[in-house]
Curated annotation (Swiss-Prot):
One of its GO terms (biological process) is protoporphyrinogen IX biosynthetic process from glutamate. This is Glutamyl-tRNA reductase. Disulfide bonds: none annotated. Substrate binds at residues 55-58, 114, 119-121, 125. It comes from Burkholderia cenocepacia (strain ATCC BAA-245 / DSM 16553 / LMG 16656 / NCTC 13227 / J2315 / CF5610).
Length: 432
């Protein structure tokens, strides 16, 4: 089985492309079924395995397959699934085989490949991806082992290095940007759209600034209400957004919507109602919640996840020593995993040997039972049984020895001596 990771992320593709390749949660299970079918074939000795990781910053396909053309098949599937021409998608895609795929998984889970160096959210997202793949019946021995070791490595990296300390989160970066627009965040009204983990983090950071008002709008009213109450805020129906948008100076949005929920026209009306007082907007969703054209309005300051990433990266340089430590740990664990993977390659051969030997045994036992039932001498039957088993079990090795010549023959002889420890060595002339 070959391991392969294929995907795009914030290093290789802008948010405009990432949002087109993202998988909504409800689509992942059925997508896994069609993705696995790419690698199914009559010649495949093993069932292919797959998992999909889709976040704001990356969409990645992890697979284990016998298909030697897996890279081309995976890229073609991703292109067809999202209806994006291969020529448009391919320049932004990375394909990582074997040890590169393992190293990448370890780095991603440890926060080394994140926009926010050392952030922990990605680890939870990977665990969710594995849980979804398991429920879809898409995981097997290889990816299960890969992800279990991935989680163990992430725990080791975070427990033995300072990779996650003093990191500037996306939420903190949003507050810093708001402070560039408004002298005091405490004088502003803040609206959060959504009630997921990212919005919760942002609400925590903005609430620490003591805003004039904090409001949460969410499709599920109960969940929005609970989040608002945590920060002494209020909840409002998401349906009221078009008519109340003008009330807010700061708007932070991060929902799972597949289409924008804030359009250009609605923001234009809000700006007019505010008499052109500025609105600071942060769109942390992928796909985006706010139409990108909104950013062209004169009195609107719109920032996406990629924009916040520039601020986040400013704080990454100071932790390069921790990065070096983490990379060293990961490299050791990659080698350990590849050793395990190498041992797995002989499992089908061993299984076949067991099956073949057992078939020979059963055939000879059945023959012996018939002879005994006929009344033949038990001692003679047992002797014939043991002789037949001996001849059949050594037939393969002796035939192989007779077929090869030269260096191959010498290598095979040495190999056979290892199998049969009592075989005499070439310099043993005693015959014993």
């Amino acid at each position: 089985m070959q391991l392969l990771t294929i995907g795009i992320n914030h290093h290789t593709a802008p948010v405009a492309l990432r949002e087109r390749v993202a998988f909504p949660l409800e689509q992942i299970k059925p997508a896994l079924v069609t993705f696995k079918n790419v690698f199914l074939g009559p010649q495949a000795p093993n069932t292919p395995e797959a998992a999909i990781l889709s976040t704001c910053n990356r969409t990645e396909l992890y697979c284990a397959t016998d298909d030697r053309a897996a890279r081309e098949g995976a890229l073609r599937w991703l292109s067809e699934y999202h209806r994006i021409p291969v020529d448009e998608l391919a320049p932004h895609v990375y394909a990582l085989p074997q040890s590169e795929a393992v190293r990448h998984a370890f780095r991603v889970a440890s926060g080394l490949d994140s926009m926010v160096l050392g952030e922990t959210q990605i680890l939870g997202q990977m665990k969710d991806a594995v849980r979804t793949a398991t429920e879809a019946g898409a995981l097997g021995t290889y990816l299960n082992q890969l992800f279990q070791r991935t989680f163990a490595v992430a725990k080791e990296v975070r427990g033995t290095t300072e990779i996650g300390t003093q990191s500037v989160s996306m939420a903190a970066a949003a507050v810093r940007l708001a402070q560039r627009i408004f002298e005091k965040v405490s004088d502003q009204r803040v609206l959060f759209i959504g009630a997921g983990e990212m919005i919760e983090l942002c609400a925590t950071h903005f609430a620490a600034q003591g805003p004039r008002e904090l409001v949460v709008a969410n499709r599920t009213a109960e969940r929005g209400q609970r989040l608002a109450e945590r920060f002494n805020g209020r909840a409002m129906p998401l349906a009221d957004l078009p008519t109340r948008m003008h009330e807010f100076d700061i708007i932070v949005s991060c929902t799972a919507s597949t289409l924008p929920i804030i359009g250009l026209g609605a923001v234009e009306r809000a700006v007019k109602a505010r008499r052109h007082r500025p609105i600071f907007m942060v769109d942390l969703a992928v796909p985006r919640d706010i139409e990108p054209e909104v950013g062209k309005l004169k009195d609107v300051f719109l920032y996406t996840v990629d924009d916040l990433g520039a601020i986040v990266r400013e704080g990454n340089a100071s932790r390069q020593a921790a990065v070096a430590q983490a990379e060293a740990i990961i490299e050791t664990r990659v080698q350990n995993f590849m050793q395990w993977l190498d041992t797995r390659s002989v499992v089908p051969v061993i299984r076949h040997m067991h099956t073949q030997a057992d078939a020979l045994r059963r055939a000879e036992v059945e023959k012996a039972q018939k002879l005994l039932a006929r009344g033949d001498d038990p001692a003679a039957v047992l002797e014939a049984l043991s002789q037949a088993l001996t001849n059949k079990l050594i037939h393969g090795p002796t035939s192989a020895l007779n077929r090869v010549n030269g260096a191959d023959r010498d290598s095979l002889i040495d190999l056979m001596r290892g199998f049969y420890q009592h075989a005499p060595r070439s310099n043993d002339q005693s015959g014993h």
